[in-house]
Amino acid sequence: SLDTIPVPVPLNFTPADSNWYFLQTAEEGKAVHYWLTDSLIWKQDTLQVEVSYLKSDSMNILRPQTDTVQFTVRRRPVEKKKKKKDDEPEPTKFLSVNTHAPSSMDVFDYITMTFEEPVARFDSAAIHLRQKVDTIWTDVPFEFEHDSLDVRRYNLYYDWEPGGEYEFAVDSTAFHGIYGLFTDKIKQAFKVRQIEEYGNVFLNITGADSIAFVELLDNQDKVLRRRPVIDGRAEFYYLNPGKYGARLVNDTNGNGVWDAGDYEKGIQPEMVYYYPHIIEFKANWDATQDWNVTAVP
């Protein structure tokens, strides 16, 4: 991942203010995107910027680095449009959005809206969530937030009722992108899964530090869930039936993630322990396991 986020300094153009771009990290922190907001800037054929950042050298020590970068726009040739009848209107090009609201919603899941470009403004009154009560669709309150990591994404949170039926709807023109496009109307219905479809995992842990967390893993070691160890116990609810691995991290600095330490400062990497068995359970089961992390398998 990037050690620091490069800050671009204009060389051959002068922005009207400091808010001339949106910043978006991508590829799990390995890349960064800059979305230009000023048309006087992004309409130029060539942009030159100076970027300063910290870069790890061959000894893995961070050193200041400054580069000059030039971006050249390659214009696509204008396509010839087919002749249309005088009374035939041009089709409207809408702001594209990928909405995550699956027809079978997990009880712990939430709705996401990921736009093709950052949003300049939106009308919160044009966003609706309705629940089917008996036979009547009833509006319910919800939380709608800008994602903290992806500048193009917004999240809708609600405490779903297991087995409940819902409808997510957005009026047309509710969202306007930074390049002038607006969204079409959206309507998606879905049903929340029942509690009986899930299982739970409870780990009774000994031998760990006072601050630690446990991660549940799939068969590729991908992290599926992360929970803190509280009073010697890590609890995972609403899991899909199947097989899981687990690992514990002694969270020395309490920041909720594994840290590699600092060689120059003599700080050791945080200790990691892997559970020596596969955790397997069926639907509507509770799997309770005792785990002494320092015990020899």
Task: Tell where the protein language model's regions lie, with residue ranges.
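N-terminal targeting or signal-anchor segments and their processing/structural boundaries
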Residues: 1-297
